[in-house]
């Protein structure tokens, strides 16, 4: 049965993993990763719960105002980095000049962005870009624009509709002239789109895409049922030896990252955090507990309660990496991959933990993640506190470890008995072989 399922899943997962556009999207978000880490660090520092006890109100306001710009300049305009990254990596995948692909994508996005702010009272302010258009609110338009502009740009380049300079011209100058016609045509397309939408429909592409595509998708992706489905497929893919995170996250990351940016914007503005499900939720309360499947609980269970020598050796090897959320020694050494004995807890435990965590946050027992990006190698409990800015975030992880322990224990016990029987049989065979060798020598 497992072989038939594997034969069905592996080709699909392979196509998803090798899809050009999903790879580009993943790389584009990783381009923004170090910048979001920088911004997140200062969000944590400016919102430490004890600051109001060591600073007066005026000093605290000044501190948050001066250092809070770090999150606005990174997480607050994340769409800018993603758009450039998509244009860059898409062009690179087609082996055309990547830097110009990124720059053209970014300008195409800006051409569709309204340079106007309408205050609640007073006249509109022109010549400025609302920051929210460059953050979560503009994410989906940015991605769509970047892919379209990248495709237009590379097709024009590949058709040789470029200006070719003499051989003696410096390479930088030659490349600039080569990109001139593709850039002009691509940018003209998006300029005309903006003109038509503005003149004939009295709106802008940001609002069109946000209301027609982004809001429905984000609303769907923030629900617990789609999240549980995503967790289910992540675990199933890992069971068959495929990297579930890379495959599923390449589809879900645009939604989860958008939710994260919206949460951070609300948090830094002092508003209620709107979403429970987001990228940090998925990383901290699934991967951030010893790696995929929360295997740190499995390691502790084996070391404390199991007797099999093989299982204990694997767990000892997996303990140190597991503290930093690296669990390949457990997945492939225990093994978990293609092991029918433990497919049930492997799939069930993360889904139960995800549901329990969601319900605890919905009930207000644990604050939801604030939107800060916590490096995935930060150990358990610490990453929970950092993600939620509350000790309850870490406590929730400890409770989740107990849940994983309860679900896994009977299955590990069964596996332990089987391994003990094999080890005893192997020991008997080795003893018999040694006695046989001794008798031959005598």
From Swiss-Prot:
Originating organism: Bacillus subtilis (strain 168)
Name recorded for this polypeptide: PTS system oligo-beta-mannoside-specific EIIC component
Transmembrane segments annotated in the record for this chain: 28-48, 67-87, 97-117, 138-157, 177-197, 205-225, 228-248, 286-306, 329-349, 365-385, 391-411
Pfam family, one: PTS_EIIC
Compartment annotation: Cell membrane
UniProt remark on domains: The EIIC type-3 domain forms the PTS system translocation channel and contains the specific substrate-binding site.
Gene: gmuC
GO MF, one example: protein-N(PI)-phosphohistidine-sugar phosphotransferase activity
Membrane topology: Multi-pass membrane protein
UniProt KW keywords: Cell membrane, Membrane, Phosphotransferase system, Polysaccharide transport, Sugar transport, Transmembrane, Transmembrane helix, Transport
SS bond list: none
GO biological process, one term: phosphoenolpyruvate-dependent sugar phosphotransferase system
General function of this protein: The phosphoenolpyruvate-dependent sugar phosphotransferase system (sugar PTS), a major carbohydrate active transport system, catalyzes the phosphorylation of incoming sugar substrates concomitantly with their translocation across the cell membrane. The enzyme II GmuABC PTS system is involved in the transport of oligo-glucomannans such as cellobiose or mannobiose.
Main location: membrane
Entry's induction text: Up-regulated by konjac glucomannan and by cellobiose and mannobiose, the possible degradation products of glucomannan. Repressed by glucose via the carbon catabolite repression system. Also repressed by GmuR.
